[in-house]
Amino acid sequence: ACPCSLGLATPLAVLVFTTLASSRGILIKGGEVIENTSRLDHVVFDKTGTITEGKPSLKETFLLDQSMDRQYLLRIAASLENLSEHSIGRAVVGAWNGDLLPVCDFRATPGRGIEGTADNKAIVIGNKAFMKDHALIAPDHTVPIGALTLPYEQAGDTVIYMGWDSILRAVLIVSDCLRKESANTVKEILLQGKRVTVVSGDNRITTAAIASAACIDDVVSEMSPEGKRDYIRGLQQSGSRILMVGDGINDAPALTEAFVGIAMGKGTDIAMESADAALVRSDLAAIPYFMDLSLRAYRVIRQNIFWAFFYNIVAIPLAISGMLHPIIAAGAMAASSLFVVLNSLRIKKGAPA
């Protein structure tokens, strides 16, 4: 008998786990992630950049003020969005190829929109609630905006409003494709017996459309970063253990609050810092694998510790009493360590080649 097996019980299993996880592009910050992930019962996905590709493009631009020049309006929008960290902003910037206007007094309100002064105009860009906050209204003789945007929302597109001087000037439609692996990933998680939810700052129609395409029935929409955090907190106070997957600055509070937080590899720095693990390749298919791997690793760690204690508790008294021949004792020492090594390698069972 020997403490070697006890010393190997956890570190060796963690080493095998981290090797397998990193081979699928998952990096963890600490060994406690294994235990926490093995105990999860609910997975919450952010929408934009998580179950969608995070490569939005500007699909349509509708002018509500017909006196406006489309290119001028797009230039103003791109000038402000260039200062934003949100992926939606990149779609607007990418649609403009010219020079940008200088912007001052820029301010971003996470989950709602941005504002700033460009060309001596106090510009406001964001969602419908952000427009209401700034008392912006549509000009007279305009086609009902709801009728204009509904088909796009039902297709899962994001609607952005833009205006200044108390008047809505344009509606921008941004499209972001669903990740090809999202639906199968969700199905695998559901087969593991976990609940799956999508949360988003987008409106309910758009969020529900994307969620439906990803085979997710549980939808929580129009959430601010603090709202996402409070939603996670409320679930966990009710006894749930949450895995939160997100990519943006809007997800950072929720990633910190969750039992386990996983940041997409192409996400913002603050999201990466707030999470317990990072999905380096941004491949959602690794999530159910990671959950199953954590469960197997935690079981093996418990088995290793149990048998290491068992060997020592049984063999040490026998060795002290002289009932064990030294050669047999040496063999028992080697056997206990060998068992821990071989048992730790069992974590590989079910791992892809």
Per-region residue spans from a language model:
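Hydrophobic alpha-helical segments characteristic of transmembrane helices
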Residues: 1-6, 312
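Conserved catalytic phosphorylation-site environment of P-type ATPases
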Residues: 5-80, 235, 254, 347-350
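Conserved beta-strand elements of the Class I
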Residues: 41-44, 124, 170, 243
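A general beta-strand register signal
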Residues: 52, 108, 117, 124, ...
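ATP-binding catalytic core of ATPases
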Residues: 62-114, 132-150
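Conserved ATP-binding TGD loop and adjacent catalytic N/P-domain core of P-type ATPases
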Residues: 120, 140-142, 148, 156, ...
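Membrane-embedded transport module
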Residues: 275, 280-353
